[in-house]
A protein has these predicted regions:
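Structural signature of transmembrane alpha-helix termini at the membrane-water interface
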Residues: 30, 34, 123-128, 250, ...
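Functional transmembrane alpha-helices
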Residues: 88-101, 196-200, 204-298, 317-334, ...
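Extracytoplasmic/periplasmic/luminal assembly and interaction segments
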Residues: 162-208, 358
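Conserved PDZ fold ligand-binding element
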Residues: 149-172, 335, 394
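Internal alpha-helical transmembrane segments
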Residues: 22-23, 34, 69-142, 287, ...
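Terminal peptide-recognition signature
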Residues: 24, 62, 110, 149, ...
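Small-residue-rich helix-interface/hinge motifs
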Residues: 8-86, 294, 301-323
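PDZ/PDZ-like groove recognition
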Residues: 119-156, 168, 258, 354-357, ...
Length: 395
C-alpha cells in the first residue's frame, strides 16, 4: 500500500513539474501563432511521440518522456528546432526575414506565462479560507550549548537584525545569508531585550551529511504553520519578495567572496524533485506553494542573457533592433553550442552531487534530524528548499 501511495505522489509531482514547463512552452507557442510565425510542432513531453495529430499545419504530440515539453518554431530558433527534431536543415534564411521585435515577443512569452501561472497559484492559495500565511521571524528560540552561536554569545530571545551587513526580517532571509556566508566568520547584529543592538561574530558550521551550513540548530519560536513558500497573502508582494530572494542568490554566485558557498548551496533537478515531492506529500497547499515559487524561478532564470536560454534570444533580438543588423548566424551557432555544452555539463555535475547528497541524507537519517531544531524542517529538506532556486532558500 505504501508503494502505491509513493507512486501516486511521484505521478502528481511529474504532472506538476510538466505543467510548469508546458505552460512556458505554450507561451512561446501561442504568441508565435498570433504573430503569424511558422510553428511545426507542440509537444507535451520529450522523446518518441506516443500520439500525434496535425491541425492547421501544427503537429501536436504527446511524447514518451513526461517531463516538460517543447515547441518547434524554425523562424525564431532554427538551430534549436534542428536539435529537437533530431536532424534536418536549420532554416536560417527564414529567420533572417522575421522582424526582430517578433522574436523578442516570442522569447518573452515563455517566462511571462510562468509568471502568470505563479500569480494564478498565489491568488488561488490566498482565497483558500484554511490557508495560513506569515513567515517565521528571525527570532532565536533556543541555542544548543555545543554550537557556534552559543560560543559567540547568542541567547534565546535574541532578534537577528542583520547578517554580514544585510538586513534580515525573517528566518528564511537569515538562513539564506548563512548559506551564502558558508564557513566564513560573519557578523550578526541582534537585538536583545534590555540591552539593545549588539554585534556577534559567528562562523557557520557545515553538516557533512547534507552539505548545508548552520549556526547550530537555532530554533524559532511561534511557528506559524503557514503555507510553505508563500509567506505573504498578497500575490504581487510575494512575487516581488521571490524575485528579490532569487536575485540575491544570483548576486552571490558572481560575488567573489560569496561564490563558493553559494554554489555549494545550489541544487539541480534531483533536489528540486525531492523538494516538490516532500511538499506535495506533506500538504497539497505546500505543494502548490512550491510549484508557485518554482515558476518564478523558471521565469527569472530563463531571462538570463545566456545563449540557448530565452534571455539569449532576447539579447540577440535587442541587438538587431538597436543596431539594425543581426548577430552573424555562425556566431550565434558557436555561442549556443558552447553554452549548451557548459550548461549540460553543469547540470550533469549537479545531478551527480544531488544524488550523492540525497543518498547520504537518506542513509544517515538519524544524524540529519539532529542537525536542526524541532520546528525547522529536517536538514535534508532545508537543503532542498535552500537550493531549489538554483534555486534559493531554506524555510
Amino acid at each position: 500500500m505504501d508503494i502505491l501511495v509513493t507512486v501516486f505522489y511521484i505521478v502528481v509531482c511529474v504532472m506538476l513539474f510538466s505543467l510548469a514547463i508546458a505552460i512556458h512552452e505554450f507561451g512561446h507557442f501561442i504568441v508565435a501563432l498570433k504573430l503569424g510565425l511558422r510553428v511545426e510542432a507542440f509537444s507535451i513531453g520529450f522523446g518518441p511521440a506516443l500520439w500525434k495529430k496535425k491541425v492547421n499545419g501544427v503537429e501536436y504530440r504527446l511524447s514518451a518522456i513526461p517531463l516538460g515539453g517543447y515547441v518547434s518554431i524554425p523562424d525564431v530558433d532554427p538551430e534549436g528546432t534542428k536539435v529537437l527534431e533530431g536532424g534536418g536543415k536549420a532554416d536560417a534564411e527564414a529567420k533572417a526575414k522575421i522582424p526582430a521585435w517578433k522574436e523578442l515577443l516570442v522569447a518573452v512569452a515563455g517566462p511571462a506565462m510562468n509568471v502568470v501561472l505563479a500569480v494564478v497559484l498565489a491568488v488561488v492559495l490566498s482565497l483558500i479560507p484554511s490557508a495560513k500565511f506569515g513567515e517565521l521571524p528571525a527570532k532565536i528560540g533556543e541555542v544548543p550549548a555545543e554550537g557556534p552561536a552559543a560560543a559567540a554569545g547568542m541567547k534565546a530571545g535574541d532578534v537577528v537584525k542583520s547578517v554580514g551587513g544585510r538586513a534580515v526580517r525573517t528566518w528564511t532571509e537569515m538562513q539564506t545569508e548563512v548559506q551564502i556566508a558558508g564557513g566564513k566568520t560573519v557578523e550578526f547584529v541582534v537585538t536583545r531585550e534590555g540591552v539593545g543592538d549588539m554585534p556577534l561574530k559567528i562562523t557557520p558550521k557545515r553538516d557533512e551529511v547534507s552539505g548545508a551550513w548552520f549556526i547550530m540548530a537555532l530554533s524559532v519560536t511561534n511557528a506559524t504553520g503557514a503555507v510553505a513558500w508563500m509567506p505573504d497573502r498578497s500575490p504581487l508582494r510575494q512575487l516581488a519578495w521571490d524575485a528579490g530572494s532569487i536575485f540575491r542568490v544570483l548576486k552571490g554566485l558572481v560575488t567573489p567572496r560569496e561564490a563558493k558557498a553559494t554554489s555549494q548551496a545550489l541544487g539541480g533537478p534531483v533536489m528540486i524533485a525531492e523538494g516538490l515531492y516532500r511538499q506535495v506529500r506533506r500538504d497539497p497547499l505546500d505543494g502548490l506553494g512550491f510549484l508557485r515559487f518554482l515558476n518564478v524561478n523558471l521565469a527569472i532564470l530563463n531571462l538570463l542573457p545566456i545563449p540557448v536560454l530565452d534571455g539569449g534570444l532576447i539579447m540577440f533580438a535587442l541587438f538587431a533592433m538597436v543596431f539594425r543588423r543581426r548577430v552573424p548566424d555562425c556566431v550565434v551557432k558557436y555561442l549556443s553550442t558552447a553554452f549548451m555544452v557548459i550548461l549540460m555539463g553543469l547540470m550533469g555535475l549537479l545531478i551527480i552531487r544531488d544524488s550523492w547528497r540525497s543518498y547520504k541524507i537518506h542513509t544517515h537519517k538519524d544524524e540529519v534530524e539532529k542537525c536542526q531544531s524541532a520546528e525547522v524542517e529536517k536538514c535534508g529538506e532545508s537543503v532542498t528548499n535552500g537550493t531549489a532556486n538554483a534555486t534559493s532558500q531554506a524555510r
